[in-house]
Amino acid sequence: MFEKLEELAKDNKKISDFHIRAGSPLAYRQTGEIVKVQEVVVTAQDLKDLLSMNCNEHELNKFEKTHELDTSVSLSGLRFRANFYKTINGPACVC
């Protein structure tokens, strides 16, 4: 999932948001439309890894307690605002 996310972020300037949800295909908003990457299904572990790679212990504790977190995500030198939240199907993120 991370490789595809990095590839899309680097190569396409028209993407405004990534929608990352456990159990669903990786999705992004491009010129107002949601596009799903069917070959990349996001796992709960993918999102946990994304959180742990980008958050300190205080932020992780806050996420566990409140089920949401506004932070930032860095991938290959690119930085994004991110909102992590929990759904009935597991963690999710919009960045």
Positions of PLM-derived features:
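N-terminal "pre-motor" subdomain/linker immediately upstream of P-loop NTPase catalytic cores
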Residues: M1-C95
